[in-house]
């Protein structure tokens, strides 16, 4: 499968360990918020989906908690890249969750990828954007498959 090959998965996992490992817990909120800021800069309409978690008050605990939940979902997906069956089950679960949320659109996942590809290289010394593009596409394609 050349869409997120074994080499790509290795690169993504290696990059991710350097970004999201336990030693960096203090910066997780900042990284997550930077990703969302970039998403909202790309598409201000995406903000509307997050009204119930205080998106307009980035210093509020409920927004920070939501940011961490989203990035932890990415963390889980990235760490399941080597286990395709478990990954598929997790992505189906995430797809269901996103289908049930009013206003979530497939295009937001494309924009989230652009945001990730802009922010993550700033916190990873050897970021492989090609591998991330291919593997995030594999993840996002399942989640957004039934979204408008």
UniProtKB/Swiss-Prot annotation:
It is found in: Secreted. Heme b binds at residue 98. Disulfide bonds join 4-135. One of its GO terms (cellular component) is extracellular region. PROSITE patterns: GLOBIN (PS01033). Keywords: Disulfide bond, Heme, Iron, Metal-binding, Oxygen transport, Secreted, Transport. Residues 3-148 form the Globin domain. GO terms for molecular function: heme binding; iron ion binding; oxygen binding; oxygen carrier activity. InterPro entries: Globin, Globin-like_OT, Globin-like_sf, Globin/Proto, Haemoglobin_extracell, Mb-like_M. Gene3D superfamilies: Globins. Pfam families: Globin (PF00042). PANTHER family: BLR2807 PROTEIN, GEO09476P1. Giant hemoglobins of worms are formed of a monomeric subunit and a disulfide-bonded trimer. Belongs to the globin family. Disulfide bonded trimer of chains IIA, IIB, and IIC. This is Extracellular globin-2B. The lineage of its organism: Eukaryota, Metazoa, Spiralia, Lophotrochozoa, Annelida.
């Amino acid at each position: 499968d050349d869409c997120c090959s074994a080499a790509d998965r290795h690169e993504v996992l290696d990059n991710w360990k350097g970004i999201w490992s336990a030693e960096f817990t203090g910066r997780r909120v900042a990284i997550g918020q930077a990703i969302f800021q970039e998403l909202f800069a790309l598409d201000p309409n995406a903000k509307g989906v997050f009204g119930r978690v205080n998106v307009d008050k980035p210093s509020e605990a409920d927004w920070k908690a939501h940011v961490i939940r989203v990035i932890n979902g990415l963390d889980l997906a990235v760490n399941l890249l080597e286990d395709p069956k478990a990954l598929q089950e997790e992505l189906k679960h995430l797809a269901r969750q996103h289908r049930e949320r009013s206003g979530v659109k497939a295009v937001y996942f494309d924009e989230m990828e652009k945001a990730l590809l802009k922010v993550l290289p700033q916190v990873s010394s050897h970021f492989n954007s090609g591998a991330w593009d291919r593997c995030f596409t594999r993840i996002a394609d399942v989640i957004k498959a039934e979204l408008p």
